[in-house]
């Protein structure tokens, strides 16, 4: 497994993290992102009604290879979720 992440994938990963922060700061939803550099992987999950000890997370992505394409696909999923949330709150 190649553990090196390309510059374009790193940039996309930063965009993904920014979107997670924007969702968490702009809505009642809580968006989490885990980055595992030793595995070259990441995961994103969401609590639509905010985090609580008893709430279940909605898994958005569990990616085992950080590529620009994989990260952009996850970002597209989050964009669709943002559109759904915009009816309730402003992201």
Segments from the language model and where they lie:
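Negatively charged, low-complexity tracts enriched in Asp/Glu with abundant Ser/Thr
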Residues: 1-41, 50-91
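Single-stranded nucleic acid-binding surfaces, predominantly the OB-fold ssDNA-binding core
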Residues: 47
């Amino acid at each position: 497994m190649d553990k090196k992440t390309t510059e374009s994938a790193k940039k996309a990963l930063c965009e993904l993290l920014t979107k997670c922060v924007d969702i968490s700061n702009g809505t009642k939803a809580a968006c989490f992102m885990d980055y595992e550099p030793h595995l070259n992987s990441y995961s994103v999950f969401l609590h639509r009604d905010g985090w609580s000890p008893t709430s279940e997370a909605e898994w958005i992505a569990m990616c085992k290879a950080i590529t620009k394409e994989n990260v952009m696909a996850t970002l597209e999923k989050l964009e669709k979720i943002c559109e759904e949330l915009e009816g309730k709150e402003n992201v």
